[in-house]
Amino acid sequence: MDENEKQAASKPSAEGTVNHKRPSAKIIAIVCVVIVAVIAASACWFVNYQIPHNEAVEVFNAAAKGLDSRNAKLDDAISDLQDLMGSDDKPLDTSMSDAASAAIGDAQAAKKDVPEMPSDTDAINAEAKKIKGMGDYSEQLTALDTANQNLQNSIDQMKQVTNPSEQFVIERLQGLPNITGVEAAREQNDPNGNLHKDGGYTSAVFFSSDLVDQSQTYASEGYTGIPAIGTDGGGSVEVYATIEDAQKRDTYLGALDGGILSSGSHTVVGTCVVRVSDLLTASQQKAIEQSIIDSLTRL
């Protein structure tokens, strides 16, 4: 093969050459427009929908958290009162327990739970606005607090008049209107003979009153002091170990009411029986009795 043939053989054939064509400017422009449009649409969607939606969700969650907090405060107040009601301590005034139950029922009925979050942004905003206005429990919290305090006070009063000491009764009787003298009975001058006996009173404090015509009273023979005259001279406070003993005594005295053995008015306060002279009018008895009850139960 001569030199010319070698050169011809070494040259690539024009027919076997790959023709790499560049994309036209029109296609590039179209692609760019599409990309820009997609980016613009995405940005528009994010700005006009996703951001407002996220903000709405945040507002909703914040409102829900606020309502949860208000609900927790209400639940705590309800729980505190329920715990007090469930304790072994009993109130002096049982109506305080009824009032506490009513306050709890009203609070539970007023409680609002957080609703489910809607999917629509506008609906989320609307629901969040509603939630912010929910859970104003100021009235219920005040009622629960009042019921709690009243019940606790009544429990404390019951403890105070449950087998109180003799000295406590004496101190609470001294200085009351129309009570001129106070003296605790001893076994030697107890007109009823019930002191320290099984089912009898643990102490009995007698008092005299300036409303009683003492010339109409008579001391038990051989007895001295205010107790010797019994309840006729003014009255007495008999203290028992249990409510049952006090109620049993009150029932016994009630059987004598209206007869020649009637010894005056009588009422049970805790484990005490407050008695007032039969020589006083009904209104006088009531006034002295209430004065004594108020003093014994004063915290």
Residue ranges and their predicted role:
Residues 76, 83, 94-98, 102, ...:
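N-terminal "mature-domain start" segment
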Residues 93, 155-160, 234-239, 273-281:
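Second-shell loop/turn segments in exported
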Residues 107, 174-259:
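Short, solvent-exposed recognition patches
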Residues 162-166, 229-233, 243-246, 278-285:
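Solvent-exposed, acidic/flexible segments
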Residues 226-229, 250-299:
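A short, solvent-exposed beta-edge/loop patch
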